[in-house]
Amino acid sequence: LDRMIAPPCGMKRIFEFSGADHVDESDLSLRVDPARPGVWRFVILGRGCWSDRVHNVFVYPRGTRPAELRAGAPGRSVAGPRLQQQAMQLVFREANGIAMRAGCEDPAFLADTSVRKARRPGQAWEEIWSATACEVTRKFLVMFTPEAGGKTRVAVVLFD
């Protein structure tokens, strides 16, 4: 799991299960009854490389077939899996561009996410996402803005 987010570090990795919640697929801050539509979010603490990391794994039940697993952004993001995917693409584009201009050829990886402005239903919220490349960590402000029709606009700016 850690290798999906960060490059190998040569140290033994230890993972601890920290909990699971059945949450709304578009708002991870909302717990929902397991009998209702949603997604399971497993929180895994990873230790052994760099600093401790909080990993989010989304589990999609598929009836009698094995569940589908998807790694989410590390840390405390409350964005749903689809919004996280959009934000990751934007953060990686910015982080890799900055790294390339500085002569770094290593791809960036996400180190952490946290909520800056709390999420309230129907309102915009902000998160801080950290990405690392060539041992340089950059922070990005990720802004999520709900729009008419149920869509959410995602924007990213450097926040160093």
Predicted features, each with a name:
Residues 1-160:
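Cysteine-centric segments in proteins
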